[in-house]
Amino acid sequence: MFFSNNFYISDMIPYDKRSGKIWYNGELVDWSNVKVHVLSHGLHYASCVFEGERVYDGSIFKLEEHTSRFFHSARRMGFEIPYSEADINAASNSIIKNQKVDNGYVRPVAWRGSEMMAISAQQTKIHVAIATWEWGSYFDPKLKVEGIRLNISNWRRPAPNTIPWDTKASGLYMICTLSKHEAEKNGYTDSLMLDHEGNIAEATGANIFFKDKSGDLHTPVPDSFLDGITRRTVIEIAKSKNIKVHERKINPNELKNFIGCFLTGTAAEVTPVSCIAENEFKVCDLIIGLNESYQQLVRKKKAA
């Protein structure tokens, strides 16, 4: 995979022009024949939820946890996915084998259909699709070694009583796109977002950790943003190494006190951060070690 100005060469093939199959409403359908009507409620009113999963050596990492969150997101958005979690797990495993994806990405998505076009849409059909494709690093592999650069976004994560914050609902990513575009325009790779109280929250699609001078880790309390599956995994790895992890409110003024920083996420995996605005960080052995342990874990199990 090659990178150029934050674009992946593999992404130059438009996603609607690819070949193979997509699992769509219970059937394997030709990639080019999967269509969504322009008057779908999910498109106009963001009644849509999704997941993002990684395939390592032919096996989906923590598939059950991702599927469980997929169903939780749908329920929080007021609709039921018309399949069981076991059905979705089986379909996900089936599609990666059909597409011969060995190391890639899986995208389940569910949305309200086009039967109604209004704020209220309780009689709409719920559509479900699962697509997969070969995919390498989310960030430039060179930057995964040197560390990526973040600005601080002007957009903030909304207060938890204003949105279904503990979901992967499509509408929640609007400010993430705005923030990342602004960061890229100004020469950064990604953006750090604050919460509604002005404390550190997360990057546009990943959780964040900091290392202090004593070797302890600090990460924001996920009370207005996702408690990521990768975040929880890395905390478990850190504790197994007797690294103390403090989950707490972190003020941006504390950035100058930390010596290391990294992001975690299904796409980002474990990615070091070299700077946030004017605050610089070292890619230290602790971060390198956590990344190595994470890579060993995700590639531990092979597909049967």
Identify what each model region corresponds to:
Residues M1-S94, I119-A304:
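Helix-start/capping segments and mature chain N-termini
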Residues N89-M116, W133:
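Short, acidic/charged, Gly/Pro-enriched secondary-structure junctions
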